[in-house]
Regions:
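Nucleotide-activated sugar donor-binding and catalytic core shared by glycosyltransferases
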Residues: 1-126, 135-252
């Protein structure tokens, strides 16, 4: 739309690559990089991706992750609400789970496998709390699948931050929640075969879990729990990405 209206485009989170051509977000990222005038990258790897792909005549600036800015700004405002379920549930160790990626919910077989793994983890390792994405809820009903974990309706950002603060572990296919778990010093299992946030895997802050390999989830998650060591926030900037973008655009 910006290109059609001849409005200069700024791409925040430029240069990220998962190298999964079947993921719609991957196509959107690459297309946005090609039409944007300003490319603001969150990481050194993202910057190198753009340079390797031959982007020229654009402003490329590494600023860090705007999601770190947001978390630092709003973490103190995190809040529990009754729709999340009984507050007593959150007083014991639990795993926070989310799932919404097209590749995970579009296939009946793949979704059934993930549901089985989450149910088993809930029954044998620790309770799982899962705010259910509307698209996932539709697919579960369509495929006749039953989640026996502790399901909640969709929650807002401040509620999610509160739950994240209480959680012992995160199980997610969300790129954003992977990082928020890391920023909150929580280990995570990424329910995908790849991630654009490769630094999390390299640092041992998260581990990939590819459902197509049909491996049990529990051993991988338990190993992540035992091996995780909270790290620094350096790979994703200093929490001032938004300020750097404003200054670069001459809006300060």
């Amino acid at each position: 739309m910006a290109q059609e209206c001849k409005v200069p485009l700024v791409h925040i989170e430029a240069g990220l690559r998962s190298y999964n051509d079947e993921m719609p977000e991957e196509h959107n990222r690459i297309e946005s990089d090609h039409i944007a005038k300003w490319l603001f990258t969150p990481t050194q790897q993202a910057t190198e991706n753009l340079k390797r792909e031959g982007f020229k005549g654009r402003v490329i600036e590494q600023v860090g992750d705007v999601m770190l800015d947001a978390l630092q700004m709003f973490q103190s405002s995190a809040v529990y609400t009754e729709k999340m379920g009984p507050i007593s549930f959150f007083h014991k160790p639990f795993a926070l789970a989310t799932m919404h990626r097209f590749e995970n919910i579009s296939s009946p077989e793949r979704l059934a496998f993930l549901v089985d793994q989450l149910n088993t983890f809930n029954d044998t390792v620790m309770p799982v709390w899962m705010p259910l994405h509307p698209a996932t809820a539709v697919r579960l009903k369509e495929f006749g699948l039953n989640l026996t974990v502790h399901v909640a309706p969709p929650v807002g950002y401040l509620e999610m931050l509160w739950a994240l603060k209480q959680a012992a572990l995160v199980l997610t296919d969300s790129g954003g929640l992977q990082k928020e778990a890391y920023y909150s010093d929580k280990p995570s299992v990424t329910l995908r075969g790849e991630t654009e946030w490769v630094e999390l895997i390299q640092m041992g802050a998260s581990v990939l879990y590819d459902p197509s390999e049909n491996q049990p989830l529990a051993p991988i998650a338990l190993n992540m729990l035992s091996s995780f060591k909270p790290g620094t926030k350096a790979p994703y900037g200093d929490g001032k990405a938004s300020q750097k973008i404003i200054h670069a655009l001459g809006l300060a």
